[in-house]
Amino acid sequence: IALETGNADVEVKLVNSALVSIHIDGYKVSNPIGFQGRDVAVQIYTAFAPMVHIGALEKVADELALDLVAVAAEPFAVSRSVLGSDTDSNFTAILADIGGGTTDIAVVNDGGVEGTKMFGIGGRSFTRTIASDLDLSFKDAEKLKLNIDHDKLKPTVKKKVDAAIDKTLEVWLSGVELALGDFDNVDYLPNRILLC
């Protein structure tokens, strides 16, 4: 944990654990019962969260008189929502969820979540660049970003907004490339990318 977080003192809790795949002698099987083989490989997806975050969620649920049934890593939850409950799914894709402050990436191969990565560039980064480059308030820059394809937008303004977006997009693409480069345990990356 210290290697990933840079903090040896952080307490964490397992929040997700899911079977990704089972291979017997190199062949993928959905249920190993009844199979024989020399080489069994089981891949499991796990996600951990700092106890301070879990505690905050428990406190909010308690104050709202709600039961906290489960906590899930967001990219895992997004991928499960796409997959549904089909345990035999052969769905394969890279899911990129671009949020306000972060981008979460999940790699799904043959219905199994191979892993997830997150980096700190999201929609607000694009908005801040537009605001800075066009000397606008954050609120006005957000409106421009959301209405970039609107017919009433002047071509000169659209060109400036596009240029601002392109600057942040270059950095964002580098983040995607670095995140996907961390999947060195995956035989191949899916050729389909879905943006959420």
Tell me what each language-model feature is:
Residues I1-I94, G112-E114, G123, N147-P155, ...:
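Nucleotide/phosphate-binding catalytic cleft detector across ATP-hydrolyzing
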Residues T116-M118:
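Residue-level detector of high-confidence beta-strand sites
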Residues D88, L95-T102, V108-G111, G120-R124, ...:
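A short acidic Gly-Thr/Ser loop motif
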Residues D67, D135-S137:
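Helix N-cap / loop-to-helix initiation motif
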Residues S137, A141-L144:
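Small-residue helix-packing motif on alpha-helices
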